UniProtKB/Swiss-Prot annotation:
Pfam families: Peptidase_C78, UfSP2_N, UfSP_MPN_N. This is Ufm1-specific protease. The active site is at 421, 545, 547. Keywords: Chemotaxis, Cytoplasm, Endoplasmic reticulum, Hydrolase, Membrane, Protease, Thiol protease, Ubl conjugation pathway. Belongs to the peptidase C78 family. The lineage of its organism: Eukaryota, Metazoa, Ecdysozoa, Nematoda, Chromadorea. It comes from Caenorhabditis elegans.
Length: 589
């Protein structure tokens, strides 16, 4: 998708505007009105750069859990995007327990799609003012309540192969997805460690609740049950009377057609809630598999229609900010950087995600399956400050916003003890930009950092491969050269002045959220947060120390002060300090 304004992902199939009366009050549903208002604001934030959209009619889709009477997502869309094909794409990307439950009527205009049980009555003024009371007055069948995130994630990797004829790829992709859906009953999911099996059950076994001990109190982004997918060659036919069941048919043609073989490894993820029966889990596993296949089909067809040919995809699972369920996408892997950026912009609009920061970079995907974790985990400790216990705040705490990796002396087989602390602080900062979706470029090595400084003529050629120190200025130069990032500076004449600038640091963590490199007294450290009492002036700094030379032992790192809250006296009163505050771009998606 080369244009973020493309109307639909598959086809137009647009619904005509209708005016719908309020639904009868016969059941009580739950909705998080603030989350709905935020989604509306996110979509409208895209229109600020497009004058043609400012007055365009807006409608939307309401997705939820019918059995629990919960609205999970209210996704707003401009009129041209209110299509059945987009509804199918959105649903195929959501958790397998979530489906279309309603439609929207905004200022008397609505686009009704089949499957909705009710229509939310909204006004532009209500949405812009975030008026919960007005919403509840107009929608008496709803309670405003934050829906809790719950359930374990069942995850498995399933491979499937499609053969696509030259000139008929779209037709063959759709047919292949339909065949996969029809054959999904053949899949059995096995966890040998715990003796768990998810499969089609006989009636007497269908109500067993054998995952309750795993799903009680679980949350889907960290409590994972991994399954191996196995395909049955036959269905259980013990109660059938026919002699012949499913018979495979092979049709051979000799027309010299060129075929493209498309192999996809899809990550199938579905939730297990406390109280689910084995039948619930089996149905959900089939639905999750079908959604992966359909999502793959839609992205592939879209690529063909856009003239990119048959594209390979990879599975990615996300927990976007403010969401209480997971988002599952098949993302193209061979598109250009610009094509992928335009596609991400498109997805941000469809899912009402922020327009000002990345959410759907591959580096931001959850590593739920062990194979995904193996490919993404370099055995670095992530966010060690979250493992600090028994700290008593002295005032108001503000910290780094988003994940980062702890880089320190002696990693990567490099003995940089005594000279590499600023390089390691730089690498920690760079990891933040990777893990928060601002870049896909790997963390630079010491040599690559040195080469960048030579390239901008800050250092001579002999600097590359040396053991010379770098400081705060060099760090800002390299961030600008390699990532085109701007940095703010705080310069102080003593450690006492570092404390005086604590309000600036707090504001930085609140607005920008990046780690801060501080250099002085021939040492470099990384500041991850501040704790400031505005009444007493007492201040503490959350410091990550790159001088650590040990193994990746989180207990040692947090208990021995390598990642810890430090008093103001930690900064020497006899030395000056310079701080580098990297600024994330405001238009990166």
């Amino acid at each position: 998708m080369t244009n973020s304004q493309t109307v639909s992902l598959i086809g137009p199939t647009q619904m005509a505007p209708q005016s719908t009366p309020p639904p009868p009050v016969n059941e009580l549903w739950f909705i998080d009105a603030q989350a709905m208002f935020q989604n509306y604001a996110n979509l409208r934030s895209f229109s600020k750069s497009n004058a043609n959209e400012i007055n365009t009619t807006i409608g939307g889709f309401v997705f939820g859990r019918k059995a629990r009477k919960q609205v999970i997502h209210v996704l707003f869309a401009y009129a041209e995007d209110l299509t059945e094909s987009n509804r199918q794409f959105l649903e195929s990307s959501l958790s397998a327990d979530i489906e279309l439950v309603g439609n929207l009527n905004i200022d008397g205009q609505s686009q009704i799609l089949p499957g909705g049980q009710f229509t939310l009555q909204l006004t532009s003024r209500m949405l812009e003012n975030r008026s919960i009371s007005e919403f509840l007055d107009m929608n008496v069948m709803f309670n405003n309540e934050h829906v809790l995130m719950e359930g374990a994630s069942c995850v498995s990797r399933v491979g499937y192969e499609w053969s696509l004829r030259a000139g008929r790829e779209q037709e063959d992709v759709k047919s292949a997805a339909e065949r996969l859906s029809m054959a999904s009953f053949r899949f059995t999911y096995l966890n040998a460690e715990h003796g768990l099996v998810i499969r089609e059950q006989k009636p007497e076994a269908a109500q067993q609740k054998y995952l309750d001990k795993f799903s009680k109190g679980a949350v889907p982004y960290k409590d994972v049950i991994e399954f191996t997918a196995m395909q049955s060659l036959t269905r259980d036919t013990s109660n059938d009377t026919e002699d012949q069941k499913l018979v495979p048919t092979v049709k051979v043609t000799k027309d010299n057609k060129h075929f493209t073989r498309l192999v996809t490894i899809g990550e199938v993820v579905f939730p297990a809630f406390f109280g689910d029966s084995s039948l619930d889990l089996y149905k959900r596993s089939r639905e999750a598999f079908n959604r992966r296949a359909n999502n793959t089909m839609m992205v592939t067809v879209n690529g063909i229609r856009a003239g990119r040919g048959v594209t390979t995809t990879t599975s990615a699972t996300y927990l976007p900010p403010g969401w209480v369920s997971l988002l599952h996408l098949q993302l193209p892997t061979k598109w250009t950087d610009n094509e992928q950026r335009n596609y991400r912009i498109r997805l941000h609009k469809l899912f009402n995600l922020p327009s000002s920061k990345p959410v759907l970079r591959l580096s931001q995907a959850l590593a739920l399956h062990s194979e995904s974790a193996r490919l993404t985990n370099k055995k670095l400790i992530r966010e060690p400050h979250l493992s600090i216990t028994n700290y008593q705040p002295v005032g108001e705490i503000t910290t780094v916003n988003g994940p980062y990796n702890y880089h320190h002396y002696m990693q990567d087989g490099i003995d940089d003890s005594g000279w590499g602390c600023a390089y390691r602080s730089f690498q920690t900062i760079w990891s933040w930009f990777i893990l928060n979706g601002y870049t896909d470029k790997p963390v630079p090595s010491h040599r690559e950092i040195q080469q960048a400084l030579v390239d901008i003529q800050d250092k001579q050629a002999k600097f590359v491969g040396s053991r010379q120190w770098i400081g705060s200025t060099e760090i800002s130069f390299v961030l600008n050269e390699l990532l085109k990032l701007e940095c703010r500076f705080i310069a102080t004449n003593s450690g006492a002045e570092v404390v005086e600038r604590v309000r600036e640091l707090a504001r930085h963590f609140e607005t920008s959220g990046t780690p801060v490199m501080i250099g002085g007294n021939m040492l470099a450290h990384t500041i991850l947060g501040v704790d400031f009492n505005d009444t007493t002036g007492e201040t503490k700094f959350l410091v990550l120390d790159p001088h650590y030379t040990g193994s990746e032992d989180i207990k040692t790192i947090t208990s021995k002060g390598w990642c810890a809250w430090k008093p103001a006296s930690f900064w020497s009163k006899d030395h000056f300090y310079n701080m580098v505050l990297p600024q994330p771009p405001s238009d990166a998606i």
